[in-house]
């Protein structure tokens, strides 16, 4: 089965379970916490993703992880289901999809803002305010850094890309210059 479909199915199942308990926000925190713990610990990540390690050992790892952090029964059962079905390798994707489902249910638009340098809190607030004014909707902004854009920002949401970066401007100029045919120009007499 396609990875995106699997991810969507698991995220929807987790969301529906959380919704029935009215714990959607708590589950988002938990799935992000568990994901970051697993992603940050390479040994645990490899162990849980390995087809060689038996499921009993994987369950033991999850149980010891759960002892150290307080997570709900829904999240514990979900992690055990992922182990049972050998799907722990898609946990990070499930967390991202779950996050999108939660924000969609609250009518909050997820927006990615890329800048060359880390934006100051006042700059982040200014960007958020102006994006929300443009979209006429509450947003959840994910700020990212990409030095290759040189300056300015790039805004992404849904299938929209707004490029206000120096690199984007230079690319447009380069493309325009490439389309100009120098041989068609006639010298002025």
Curated annotation (Swiss-Prot):
It comes from the Bacteria. GO terms for cellular component: plasma membrane; proton-transporting ATP synthase complex. Keywords: ATP synthesis, Cell inner membrane, Cell membrane, CF(1), Hydrogen ion transport, Ion transport, Membrane, Transport. Signal peptide: none annotated. The keyword Membrane applies. It is a peripheral membrane protein. HAMAP family: ATP_synth_delta_bact (MF_01416). F(1)F(0) ATP synthase produces ATP from ADP in the presence of a proton or sodium gradient. F-type ATPases consist of two structural domains, F(1) containing the extramembraneous catalytic core and F(0) containing the membrane proton channel, linked together by a central stalk and a peripheral stalk. During catalysis, ATP synthesis in the catalytic domain of F(1) is coupled via a rotary mechanism of the central stalk subunits to proton translocation. Belongs to the ATPase delta chain family. F-type ATPases have 2 components, F(1) - the catalytic core - and F(0) - the membrane proton channel. F(1) has five subunits: alpha(3), beta(3), gamma(1), delta(1), epsilon(1). F(0) has three main subunits: a(1), b(2) and c(10-14). The alpha and beta chains form an alternating ring which encloses part of the gamma chain. F(1) is attached to F(0) by a central stalk formed by the gamma and epsilon chains, while a peripheral stalk is formed by the delta and b chains. This is ATP synthase subunit delta. It comes from Rickettsia bellii (strain OSU 85-389).
